[in-house]
UniProtKB/Swiss-Prot annotation:
Superkingdom to which the source organism belongs: Viruses
Pfam families tied to this protein: BTB
Family as reported in the entry's similarity comment: Belongs to the mimivirus BTB/WD family.
Domain BTB, first and last residues per copy: 2-72
CDD domains on file: BTB_POZ_ZBTB_KLHL-like
The protein's name: Putative BTB/POZ domain-containing protein R765
Organism: Acanthamoeba polyphaga mimivirus (APMV)
Amino acid sequence: MTNIQLVIKDDSNSITLNVNRDTLCSKIDYFNKMFNNFAESTKEIVSIYVLNAQIVRDLIDSKIYDREITADKKNWKYILDLYKCQDYFGIEIDSELMKDLLVPREYFGHLIDVIDLIGYNKHTVNTVVQNIPIDFNVKVFPPKLINKMVPVITDSIKVFGSKTSIDIVCLKTREIIYSLPTIGSLCNCFCYVKNKKMVFFINELSQLVAFDIRYGTSNIISLRIKKEDFNTNPYYRKNILLTDVLYRRNSDLQIIPTVNILYNKISNQLIFCHNHKHVVIIDVESYRVINMYTHSNYFDVNIDNICRYVNHNTLAINHSSNIIALWNLESYEIHTRPKPNGIINLTALIYYNTYIYKNKFQKIFVNEFYLPNKPFELKPKHSGEITFVGCSPDNKYIVIVVDYCQITIFDMEYTLSLYASCKCVSRTYIRYEYPLSIIFGSNNTMSILFETNKKNIVHVYSLKSKKSLKNYV
């Protein structure tokens, strides 16, 4: 075999290559079959008609010279036609270029045709989810594709409290999947249990609801403490005040969460405050009330909020009086600690004995329950109204947001002295109105929901790099 001229033609272009026939046959099986079984085997000039002449030239060069084809993600049509050409010539397809590819809405069908050629893998399924038009009927997809899409969609879900609803947002498709109506004052009283794909919230009728994201179904949870339950639950009988409350009412106690709802992954339990008087623990599987905490001065003292340290079974209960109660969720032992002067809001537990609080002068402090240390003030870089204080899941970062989402991040390095190693590491200004909701991710990210010009905008912000990673509309 000798050198030949290969003429590559498409509808608008023609490219001629001088190639060695032996090399071409050894690199691409399509040409091996052509030059050994068909009339082209004796020709010195061979013409082929293809979808895109330039892409086929790139393919041939990449195989002959062992070069990788690269393409800008913006050149989506080149990438899709490249895959079609690879399929036509029987060249093994690498779906790496499909990763995070975005195509215009009107070419979504073209994208699906190409993915059918490639097959369903992590890159192609992610790309389908990212490009689905909002009004597209996914029921036309093959069941195999739908089954692979479900975990991709659910894994990219964030749940935010907006003005009158709990919004379930898919960051892959950039849309609100479900909007669950609630009471405005309880729009942030919800709990997203990611491993179960469940959202627990209070609806507009003041009912506790379990919403299954996978199936879009709701289950109203009716929680009642009955007198006869005291015969089977020893924890109830220990709660003398609760017993007294029940018998004074001479009726069952209807349980409705208020303030905030927490999830204890260790024991698979929900924890919340009822009517600002009781802290209730329920089993997530059976929705059975397991235990309740009631302050000794039931009629005069309210429970303002509760906080839990994720890596330790300890719950901090912030009372309207001058104490904070620490409730061990394994032994159910209770220890009380006096509040520092002026505390109005217990914000977070960053260790089993260390907490963040806000005082009546809108100042943020870190303090320890068991050591006589002076509270350490966290001073944000901006002045104004503090709209959010929170701690990342790994307790490494404390975030304070002032006014129009001016963010100050504190790095908490736990060495011998907590306060000597607490320092401000960054500040960022994002030009939007007050954030509607802020939630932390498990990978040191923070998702911030804004409303501007009647549109919801989600910023995903990296606590590690101190940068906005992505914006979703």
